[in-house]
């Protein structure tokens, strides 16, 4: 019976998987949204307009940010700090053994469900998300708080396969940020820590691109950890929105970051709109409410009950109230940093120490002296009047379906098919069916509450008929005893709903389905049990009062006299206790809803790494070279002269002949902005060097020695701290030349090389509307080639895209640390920070 009821109540939730419209409704500062199947009906223009307005209001609170909105993409092991030196994020590629993430993914995929609870972070569409471990369940209809999630309870044996990943992640956290690991480890209650780690909870997301948000409820003095377990995709970087930086992540990568900073995911980088992709990620954190007094008291209550029942399998004899710190659930303060290619490179863990100090010094100099930045890279960090930013109407919306405004305020949808479904299933709330699911005490409470309300409705209806014998519609008095009896019946029904579902929480579609069935049951009772006319009560009126109950009931309670408020609270407690005493009918997740055993840590088992021949978590963490103090601390001071080599493409004997440029909106966008016009009118930047000499020219700038040389020239066997390859690859042809160019010049850098190039891809390439993208692709190469030719006096130009350039970098034996985007650059310039791969 329980399976049958749960199946019925979930039928409408399954509609979210069907093709249809994305539905948005902002309410109480949170955007509630779900997918609605339209059954082929037409949406009028007014509804579309209202829906669009509702969506725009929604994304004001949780906006999406694209890759183009950020300046830096980190790829290698990175430690990113704010202006005060506090670590904001630590990216560690290939941090987790693949066997551990694979084992965990096989289990945690089962924890993922389509839920509307986080739809505000997904642009209004219900994403696939779930939780595992332990949770406090504050603000949910689940009456038993501070315990295992339903997933963990139901998958005890399988849960053990997650432990290696937990151990590896915890060890990495401890090695990188030991002070915060210790604070978090000391605070998390032992009864809710996952396998000895400082984590209490996992959030698992599948194919989930989040809008900008902070993780409310995480421990303030700790860090969250994000790991990608499996997937085939590009893009979806984790972005720190207030800092303009992104962390590129692929399976087995780990990111430790301050979850109280606003963060989001950038767009999926897919060549085709309907490309197949998948991504399963996991966030590890300590849910701070689990260490607060209400939860500690719940642990103690369960432990006391277990001792009274003389349980022999207790994992704890007492519960300690630990110092949980102050958890404000407020966003972290933002201390912005100015971004340059040098500060970008200084965040690379491989360049820590002396190299980072030099890079920080160079960063300070170019921020103070804009002309030095131009001397080094050929253009400033940002150009205000360069390539214009894309207008919103040029970009594909995050969710492409038409947005239809629906009003969900706690009741149910009154569409015909939904009402018919509710009427067909109303008998599931008949007494004989409920007795198969719940204990006698709870069913009696339901029966008494139902009977009491019907009696008051009958009395009120008879009075109304006496006053007006022709009356056909029931008039609902909000201040009557009948209204309060209805609220009482709703309290009972809400507990009934909890018992009918096996999920940890009831999503909006499931809740709508239940309340629709509840209303149909009551409407039928009004007709067949107390003799009201068909439609006298009606589904619409009951729906209005259900919305009143769900969103106005608390207000009405506050308006009641104190003694009535207390009576209502006692009544609700009585209902909850009756449910707790209900017998267990089967071994499904309904057991979890009523489970109040002291079963903390009963699933925990040791992992024998030696027997399995797996690398230990401690040895795995040592691979990344974190010192005992972790990644804290500032770099040392840069002393002595810093040497920089700038390599320029050699100009040809004449500038490229002016060719006929295309005329289109996209061509004008590239060629007619003021910065582009200046390039066309200015002298080529590489004309100053003597083309007859193959030797370098030296420029001194304080304690910075800058040598300049043409590609193909000689530096006399010198090595340099840093090499800047300025638009060299665009002057090469084929596959072999760019690789040879990269190998030659990167080999002269002690620390790293900046590969500066034109990027043929529009910064919004993957989300441009098709007609805009096609127009851009038709003109971009010829337009940027003309600008490049004017800047470097070249008659042969081979511009490339970022994916092509990344391929060259990899094949040349170099490692990519990061990518820096020059904002507004008329050449759409990017700088790749690369270093020679360690042998």
UniProtKB/Swiss-Prot annotation:
<feature type="binding site">
    <location>
        <position position="215"/>
    </location>
    <ligand>
        <name>Fe cation</name>
    </ligand>
</feature>
<comment type="subunit">
    <text>Monomer. Binds to DNA as a monomer.</text>
</comment>
<keyword id="KW-0408">Iron</keyword>
<dbReference type="GO" id="GO:0008198">
    <property type="term" value="F:ferrous iron binding"/>
</dbReference>
<dbReference type="GO" id="GO:0070580">
    <property type="term" value="P:base J metabolic process"/>
</dbReference>
<dbReference type="GO" id="GO:0005634">
    <property type="term" value="C:nucleus"/>
</dbReference>
<dbReference type="Pfam" id="PF12851">
    <property type="entry name" value="Tet_JBP"/>
</dbReference>
<comment type="similarity">
    <text>Belongs to the TET family. JBP1 subfamily.</text>
</comment>
<dbReference type="Pfam" id="PF18526">
    <property type="entry name" value="DB_JBP1"/>
</dbReference>
<dbReference type="InterPro" id="IPR041241">
    <property type="entry name" value="DB_JBP1"/>
</dbReference>
<dbReference type="GO" id="GO:0015616">
    <property type="term" value="F:DNA translocase activity"/>
</dbReference>
<feature type="binding site">
    <location>
        <position position="279"/>
    </location>
    <ligand>
        <name>2-oxoglutarate</name>
    </ligand>
</feature>
<keyword id="KW-0223">Dioxygenase</keyword>
<feature type="binding site">
    <location>
        <position position="213"/>
    </location>
    <ligand>
        <name>Fe cation</name>
    </ligand>
</feature>
<dbReference type="InterPro" id="IPR043111">
    <property type="entry name" value="DB_JBP1_sf"/>
</dbReference>
<dbReference type="GO" id="GO:0006281">
    <property type="term" value="P:DNA repair"/>
</dbReference>
<keyword id="KW-0479">Metal-binding</keyword>
<dbReference type="InterPro" id="IPR024779">
    <property type="entry name" value="2OGFeDO_JBP1/TET_oxygenase_dom"/>
</dbReference>
<keyword id="KW-0539">Nucleus</keyword>
<dbReference type="GO" id="GO:0003677">
    <property type="term" value="F:DNA binding"/>
</dbReference>
<comment type="function">
    <text>Dioxygenase that catalyzes the first step of DNA base J (beta-d-glucosyl-HOMedU) biosynthesis by converting thymine to 5-hydroxymethyluracil (HOMedU). DNA base J is a hypermodified thymidine residue found in the genome of kinetoplastid parasites, which is localized primarily to repetitive DNA, namely the telomeres, and is implicated in the regulation of antigenic variation. Also specifically binds to base J-containing DNA (J-DNA).</text>
</comment>
<protein>
    <recommendedName>
        <fullName>Thymine dioxygenase JBP1</fullName>
        <ecNumber>1.14.11.6</ecNumber>
    </recommendedName>
</protein>
<dbReference type="GO" id="GO:0050341">
    <property type="term" value="F:thymine dioxygenase activity"/>
</dbReference>
<feature type="site" description="Involved in J base recognition, conferring specificity towards J-DNA">
    <location>
        <position position="548"/>
    </location>
</feature>
<keyword id="KW-0560">Oxidoreductase</keyword>
<feature type="region of interest" description="DNA-binding JBP1 domain">
    <location>
        <begin position="415"/>
        <end position="583"/>
    </location>
</feature>
<feature type="region of interest" description="Thymine dioxygenase">
    <location>
        <begin position="86"/>
        <end position="288"/>
    </location>
</feature>
<feature type="binding site">
    <location>
        <position position="263"/>
    </location>
    <ligand>
        <name>Fe cation</name>
    </ligand>
</feature>
<keyword id="KW-0238">DNA-binding</keyword>
